[in-house]
């Protein structure tokens, strides 16, 4: 019975993918991801595997660091001062950016208080090695920041310095004063924001004129099947197959994202399509190392129920990896970097 309940619970998290389900899903799978990557992997993105010889020998952690570094260059962080990292996970990208651009003030916003608590502990060792590096933990143990709280107590410029701050809040109601930052970054997190339009509206509100919104996210390419009026569910399921369920996020098209950004007065400066350097090499890595990864994780499972649940979930992941590679090769899905300017 426990086995069936655990499996059903996991499947419901994937299918429904509301905010609470996403939190539960990430909290559930993250320990296994960390085991598979050596126990210290705190980045939660697909990674950028580039297109040169060194990437042939990359592992997922190295690819994730490459993607994080790419965001810093793409987002012109060297010209920035204050950054909001929306959907910051364990704040590992923020720590990497702080190491590369030590003058930055970075505010990590995450609705997942458990991840923020872990981040606060993981960031502590960096204080001793980075000049002017401090941590402010805001609302970590107080649940999610409500819309009312965000309105009453915005984070102002005077409260920020040369620091990394951790703020427990939703990206669709950002608790910050108007025009107080010059970068808003969503590194593989915007696909979870519901409704995404609210995140764009909030980003436009808190960005200074000329500030940049930087997005890295999976997308679907195209929005229609000719003149056939498919319902959204049927249309997406026909295209994505098993990924419709295992891709545990919203399935936004690039066209819809561009339209939403423009409606908020945000000018798109650049879009880079990097799907072939994300999905296909990641899928290849998993396929080639599947046996070892399975053994590594199963060796850390303590009960028969856990092993059986893992076998089911792993089979879904494997089939999803095959499908992801196929859809990327067919240009049905892509991974995009979007740079936008507040006019």
What are the roles of these predicted feature ranges?
Residues 82-128, 132, 136-139, 156-173:
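Class I SAM-dependent methyltransferase SAM/SAH-binding core
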Residues 228, 240-327:
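Substrate-binding/catalytic lobe of Class I Rossmann-like enzymes that use SAM or dcSAM, i.e.
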Residues 1-37:
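N-terminal auxiliary segments of SAM/dcSAM-dependent transferases
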Residues 197-212:
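A short glycine-rich, Lys/Arg-flanked "PGG" loop and its adjoining helix->strand segment in the class I
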Residues 61-79:
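Conserved alpha-helix/loop element of class I SAM-dependent methyltransferases that forms part
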Residues 183-195:
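A short SAM/SAH-binding and catalytic strip from SAM-dependent methyltransferases
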